[in-house]
Swiss-Prot record:
This is Serine protease SSP1. The lineage of its organism: Eukaryota, Metazoa, Ecdysozoa, Arthropoda, Myriapoda. It comes from the Eukaryota. It is found in: Secreted. Belongs to the peptidase S1 family. Keywords: Disulfide bond, Hydrolase, Protease, Secreted, Serine protease, Signal. It comes from Scolopendra subspinipes. Residues 1-18 form the signal peptide.
Length: 286
């Protein structure tokens, strides 16, 4: 991977720039301050691997993204959350909130950590593909029932036809700036790649919607957050990357795309060298 310690060059170029879009659809990165649309409020601490991140940029602007704790000292997120070559913006500080539910207050079981290192996938830097990154915490998390790593999916199964969950803090509508200060969740069906106009099936997962009206999906601020299954523990399938919007109805999200975890396991292992990854012995999904 490409590693920068201390100051990291940040990059917000869409992972979709090399694809040709249908005329009626446009890609939108689920970037800083982009959130769950619709959905329901999650039960407090229901997802102990969920991480909220705040970045403080060189110009004083702050951003927010979702992340997943995958080992006691490692967090998984989207590359576009932490790397912006186009704007030549640097983060001065990254703050990671573990065991968080209410973003506006300090929760009883919340742990606050700072980033010691960030690793961005080298293909993202060169071509905008492989929208995935790792953050190493300065000190390991205190693992308990409120803060616990999720398992990384190691199965080749694409889970098409199954329902998965996405979670994040934020925008509850494509209209205006109504932001939720609590963790929200949405159920998203995993659909065949042909349903996503911009997708590289070996490295991406396509999701659709459970209902036609008031569609639940991910949007701005949910970037980097997980797509996961909750049976027999939590298995992380993907990392929120981008959505496509209908050009005729700009408030309508047509699909949401996640970076596929199983396609990046060797990269994650190589760069973290963590011994407590994957939960392979406890991964019951097939």
């Amino acid at each position: 991977g490409t590693r920068k310690t201390g100051i990291l060059l940040l990059f917000l170029v869409a992972a979709t720039t090399s694809f040709k879009l249908p005329k009626n659809e446009s890609p939108v990165l689920i970037s800083d301050d982009d959130r769950i649309i619709g959905g329901t409020q999650a039960y407090p601490n229901a997802y102990p691997f969920m991480v909220r991140l705040t970045t403080i940029w060189q110009n004083g602007w702050g951003g927010s993204c979702g992340r997943s704790l995958i080992x006691s000292q490692w967090v998984l997120t989207a590359a576009h959350c932490v790397y912006n070559l186009e704007k030549s913006m640097y983060w001065e500080r990254v703050i990671v909130y573990l065991g968080d539910h209410y973003s506006q207050v300090t929760d009883a079981h919340e742990q606050v950590k700072e980033a010691a290192d960030v690793i961005v996938h080298e293909n993202y830097i060169s071509s905008g593909s492989n929208d995935v990154a790792l953050i190493k915490l300065k000190t390991p998390a205190n693992i308990n029932s409120y803060v616990k790593p999720g398992c990384l999916n190691s199965k080749s199964n694409d889970f098409i036809g199954q329902d998965a969950t996405a979670a994040g803090w934020g925008l509850t509508s494509t209209i205006g700036n109504t932001i939720s200060n609590v963790l929200m969740e949405a159920t998203l069906p995993i659909v065949a790649p042909k349903n996503c106009p911009i997708i590289n099936p070996p490295t991406m997962i396509c999701t659709g919607f459970k209902r036609e009206v008031g569609q639940d999906t991910v949007f701005k601020g949910d970037s980097g957050g997980p797509l996961f299954l909750s049976k027999n523990g939590f298995t992380i399938l993907g990392v929120a990357s981008f959505v496509t919007l209908d050009n005729s109805y700009p408030q309508k999200v047509t699909s949401a795309v996640f970076t596929k975890v199983s396609a990046h396991l060797s990269w994650i292992q190589e760069n973290t060298k963590a011994t407590d990854l994957w939960c392979a012995k406890n991964n019951h999904h097939s």
